[in-house]
């Protein structure tokens, strides 16, 4: 496609690529040409995804009504119920809401706020889900309750703060890089069917890439984090010249056993990107298929 540019600002027309492009990665290449001489060239990649809904998926349970996730279920014809004592052991339960919200502050600390609209019976609910899994059920944690590593000790040193709700007792840890990179790398697994594997979670994964990782437990890690503390122990008195703190590894997506069942623990931003980013939808569908 050739477009003639005039002096000043030229409004470019939209390029209609149609609706029948095959699934895959594409490159749009743009060149600025004057008198048959290329002055400048750039390019941008984009992906086309397709989701197969020809096979009926099994039903799921959630712990709270949420328009974003229920709209997703409706679009993909997935039956759902609110988790209760009568939920079948064959029905995976999705933990789509927890009793706190976690934010990253500019200084590398973690801010946690208790949701005012959450039930006071949250611990009882988590205990019921733990018992459900122990008997052979499966739980998909898209939100992780439990302790968070914060800089709240003497001289802002790190301490694990909060309540352990899960039997594995994972600890949430800030894992967002600034000038220093923090890698989140996925591995080959059915959950990443039809998606790139063994790569850093940038590019097509940039919307769902985590900023919180899990430590202090053992599981089958599908997305792994390699990071380090910018300040040794978080101690504000050690932030000069000494260098960085410990190097650590955490999990962003992991499957752990509990009794006769399994728990999937995820810090990926899947719920936030449903009905917006197809990668989040493909991953959640793959997760549901994995546990059916």
Regions found by a protein language model. Give the residues of each.
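Short, solvent-exposed loop/turn elements at domain surfaces
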Residues: 68-72, 104, 272-276
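Loop/turn elements at helix/coil->beta-strand transitions in domains of secreted/extracellular proteins
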Residues: 89-91, 135-138, 261-262
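Stable alpha-helical elements in mature extracytoplasmic
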Residues: 65, 69, 124-128, 280-284
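A short, well-structured beta->alpha microelement
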Residues: 62-66, 70-90
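A glycine-rich, often tryptophan-bearing local segment used as a flexible ligand/cofactor-contacting loop or short
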Residues: 100-211, 266, 276-279
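Receiver (REC) domain switch-region micro-motif
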Residues: 93-96
